[in-house]
A protein has these predicted regions:
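Protein kinase-like catalytic domain
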Residues: 2, 83-84, 147
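Catalytic-loop of the protein kinase fold
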Residues: 2-21
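Activation of the activation-loop gatekeeper triad in protein kinase-fold domains
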Residues: 28-33
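Conserved catalytic-core motifs of eukaryotic protein kinase domains, centered on the activation segment
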Residues: 36-38
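Conserved activation segment of eukaryotic-like protein kinases, specifically the C-terminal portion
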Residues: 40-60
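Conserved C-lobe activation region of Hanks-type protein kinase-like domains
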Residues: 66-72, 79-140
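C-lobe helix-loop cap of protein kinase catalytic domains
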Residues: 135, 143-151, 163-170
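Regulatory extensions appended to serine/threonine kinase catalytic cores
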Residues: 157, 161-167, 171-237
Length: 238
């Protein structure tokens, strides 16, 4: 979408559909910000919980031009949801008096609960939640960049950066020796899912089935080359 000069704009959990074959499809495209033949058709809607901090104070998106970096905030949030069991990165245990009252306010003030400096920001992760340390340090740093002031100043991780980082993580997963349902990053010594199980927080019920990872012969670069080689349909004559 970005490579064609367009912006999704209203990025949220209802922007995508995932098929049984893991194919992801963008939907709700009638609200995209489209740049067509020099005319910019704006995206004038948005979901507050997915709106980046720098736009939280806007009373309306009418007449406002979105950017790729705004999209990249929503993308990082969706990835965080997937990796952390639906948890919102700006939701946690308040450390200061005015934190935790409204999600929009915490987003506005960059109160990323999992930040390396979260004590200063005023929120910390909820007890017995999935720890950020489950991820390699480079992926942790990408979330730090996406959800703090740095993302506004120097840009948030792009979709390409996320694809590369997560594909590398996929190739470095290892299986738990206790539960066939658990896989985790090879940088960890112990299984983080077992640690959560021992605290009474169970994400994966062990049914005796083995998790099949997608390492095999899958090569992302080859798949992406096929995607990029596809021919776009002709433009509509309106």
């Amino acid at each position: 979408v970005h490579e064609h000069g367009h912006v999704v704009g209203d990025v949220n959990q209802n922007s995508f559909m995932v098929g049984r074959d893991s194919k992801v499809v963008l939907i709700d495209s009638d609200s995209f910000q489209i740049n067509a033949n020099g005319t910019l058709h704006l995206c004038e809607v948005g979901v507050s919980h997915f709106t980046p901090p720098e736009l939280q104070t806007l009373s309306s998106f009418v007449g406002f031009e979105r950017t790729e970096n705004h999209d990249n905030f929503g993308l990082a949030l969706l990835i965080f949801h997937v990796l952390f069991g639906g948890r919102h990165p700006y939701s946690g245990v308040p450390l200061i008096s005015d934190a935790g009252n409204a999600l929009e306010t915490d987003i506005t003030h960059f109160r990323y609960a999992y930040a390396s400096d979260n004590q200063r920001r005023g929120l910390k992760p909820p007890p017995r939640s999935i720890p950020l340390s489950m991820l390699p340090s480079d992926v942790e740093a990408m979330f730090q960049q996406a959800f703090t002031e740095s993302g506004v100043a120097t840009g948030r991780p792009t979709a390409k950066a996320w694809v590369a980082a997560l594909d590398l993580l996929r190739q470095q997963l290892k299986k738990c020796t206790v539960s066939a349902m658990h896989v985790y990053s090879a940088h960890l010594t112990d299984c983080p899912w077992c640690a959560l199980d021992n605290q009474g927080v169970i994400y994966f019920i062990d049914l005796g089935e083995e998790v099949i990872t997608t390492s095999g012969d899958f090569v992302l670069a080859k798949v992406w080359a096929m995607v990029m080689a596809s021919v776009a349909p002709p433009a509509l004559q309106l």
